[in-house]
């Protein structure tokens, strides 16, 4: 069985602020589980879009019933690929775990799109949870636990982004006042 988590959210910020915050969201008080973020590649291609690949190391709290399968491993590596189209004010992000994929594979597809009418940035999350674990009953349990954990953490993701966006705007405001 494969589980999907879907969610939408509107940030009351312009597209530029949201995308700057996205690439600067770590560290923040709501993401203490993120240990490191490394930019592997960033380039503007002929189509005028910005392409970025990052590697993220996260710590995780696992339920006791999973530990026999993973041992003492408490972290995971995530690859993140993003494409920003400045003309359409849209960013697409794809994240997936690089390790523990036989136990659980988590793939996150996120679209950020500026809405000219409401002057907000709409975010559409689609997250796929799939396990290749063959032990009877464990596969569905792992997928369900991962799905529920992601759903619980969504609130912290939103708070973390809002925190970083407010800091971005504060920095911009300070720079404008210095120039006056």
Task: Annotate the PLM regions.
Residues 1-62:
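Hydrophobic ligand-binding cavity/cleft-lining segments
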Residues 2-8, 66-74, 84-180:
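Terminal "cap-and-tail" regions of soluble proteins that handle hydrophobic small molecules
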Residues 16-17, 81, 124:
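Generic detector of isolated residues embedded in canonical secondary-structure elements
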Residues 34, 77-79, 107:
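Short edge beta-strand segments in beta-sheet-rich domains
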Residues 40-95:
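Glycine-rich portal/gate segments that line the openings of hydrophobic small-molecule binding cavities
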């Amino acid at each position: 069985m494969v589980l999907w988590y879907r969610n939408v959210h509107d940030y009351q910020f312009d597209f530029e602020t949201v995308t700057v915050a996205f690439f600067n969201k770590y560290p923040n008080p709501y993401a203490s589980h993120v240990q490191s973020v490394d930019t592997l590649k960033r380039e503007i291609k002929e189509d005028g879009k910005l392409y970025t690949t990052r590697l993220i190391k996260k710590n995780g709290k696992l339920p006791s019933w999973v530990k026999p399968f993973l041992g003492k491993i408490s972290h995971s590596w995530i690859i993140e690929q993003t494409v920003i189209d400045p003309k359409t004010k849209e960013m697409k992000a794809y994240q997936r775990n690089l390790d523990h994929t036989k136990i659980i594979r988590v793939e996150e597809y996120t679209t950020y799109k500026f809405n000219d009418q409401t002057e907000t940035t709409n975010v559409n999350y689609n997250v796929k949870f799939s396990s290749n674990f063959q032990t009877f009953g464990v596969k569905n349990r792992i997928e369900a636990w991962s799905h529920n954990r992601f759903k619980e953490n969504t609130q912290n993701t939103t708070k973390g982004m809002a925190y970083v966006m407010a800091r971005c705007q504060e920095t911009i405001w300070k720079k404008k006042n210095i120039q006056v």
